Amino acid sequence: MPIITKTFNYTGQLQLADLPAGANTLTLHIWGGAGGAGGPDSAGDGADGAAGHYVTVTDLDISSYAGSKSIAVAIGGGGKSGELAGNANGGANGQSVTQYSGGVGGNSGPVSVSGSGGGGGGATTVTLFESGQDF
């Protein structure tokens, strides 16, 4: 069977895709959402947020799924950057359409000296199911 590549990007929505008939293995390259940058402070810009975690799954055996197969992909969004303001809230968390959103960044101090923390990136999930099943 030929190798077929499908790329999913963050949309804020669950994305569904049917796998080709006869597919028996999957190889996945998965990135989580990146963290937001820290807010600037009185000495300069805040640091960049960390990249989303990367995972590779090679030759995942999906032959036990009897019928046609589909995947549901939820791409994690990036965290929002912090800001410089007295009592500023931390950056918003990166969203996921699953319950695995990133954490909210820490708040700034009471005066405009330290910036708030950037929000954490959302998780990316991939779920395999038999076509025709409710997901």
Task: Give, region by region, the residue ranges found by the protein language model.
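Glycine-rich strand-loop-strand elements at beta-sheet edges
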Residues: 11-13, 30-129
